[in-house]
Amino acid sequence: MDSRTGELITARQAENGVFIWEIENPLYFKINQVEDMQYTRTRIYSVQIRFNHNLRRALDLHKAYLNFQVWTTSMTASGSNYLARFRQLVLLYLDRLGVISINNVIRSVRFATDRSYVNYVLENHSIKYKFY
């Protein structure tokens, strides 16, 4: 859903993509928070993926933040280690695919979190399209 207008994103907008070799560093990865749940073996990583300026311009986006909460049982990985592994798997999937779009980035996150130590993945996105 477009967070500015409240309209649903069409399939055409979600699948609209750009070749990965046309844009340098298309995605920014940021870890917002790492939580250890008390009395459990659960660690929660809050990861944000942002589209860079050139990718947003190619896809006619004003803003694109994809926020994920990854609930894991992996207690050994620190936030920076997990982010590096997560980033590597997302970019590996996109490199193999060759096209970056909103749906392909979400599919790549599904690929990166399809591990035995991941219990849940919660998504919250902030996407705004250009009007003009």
UniProtKB/Swiss-Prot annotation:
The keyword rRNA-binding does not apply. The keyword Ligase does not apply. Disulfide bonds: none annotated. One of its GO terms (biological process) is viral process. Keywords: Host-virus interaction. Increases viral DNA accumulation. Enhances infectivity and symptom expression. Homooligomer. Interacts with the replication-associated protein (REP). Interacts with host proliferating cell nuclear antigen (PCNA). Interacts with host retinoblastoma-related protein 1 (RBR1), and may thereby deregulate the host cell cycle. Oligomerization and interaction with PCNA are necessary for optimal replication enhancement. Belongs to the geminiviridae replication enhancer protein family. This is Replication enhancer protein. It comes from Potato yellow mosaic virus (isolate Venezuela) (PYMV). The lineage of its organism: Viruses, Monodnaviria, Shotokuvirae, Cressdnaviricota, Repensiviricetes.
